[in-house]
Amino acid sequence: MARKRRKGGEGLVTAIGLVRFYEEVEEKIKVPPEAVIGAAFALSIMTIALDLLLKAAR
């Protein structure tokens, strides 16, 4: 049986393309890190409050 040869550079080229794509998207969106931390904090507080409300309703 003949062996199939793999192209060596495809994976690296694809990875570099993905990094460039996400860098471009990140530049367009511009979300401040404080907003991300604030949203995560608010979501965790809401989750705890909802859990307490559901436990109290039982």
UniProtKB/Swiss-Prot annotation:
Transmembrane regions: 33-54
Keyword field contains Membrane: yes
Pfam families attached to this UniProt entry: Sec61_beta
Main localization (coarse): membrane
Domain of life: Archaea
Subcellular locations according to the entry: Cell membrane
Extracellular compartment spans: 55-58
GO biological process: protein transport
Cytoplasmic domain ranges by topology: 1-32
UniProt membrane topology term: Single-pass membrane protein
Record-level GO cellular component terms: plasma membrane
Swiss-Prot/TrEMBL keywords: Cell membrane, Membrane, Protein transport, Translocation, Transmembrane, Transmembrane helix, Transport
Function: Involved in protein export. The function of the beta subunit is unknown, but it may be involved in stabilization of the trimeric complex.
Assembly, per entry: Component of the protein translocase complex. Heterotrimer consisting of alpha (SecY), beta (SecG) and gamma (SecE) subunits. Can form oligomers of the heterotrimer.
Family membership noted in the UniProt record: Belongs to the SEC61-beta family.
Full protein name: Preprotein translocase subunit SecG
Gene name for this UniProt entry: secG
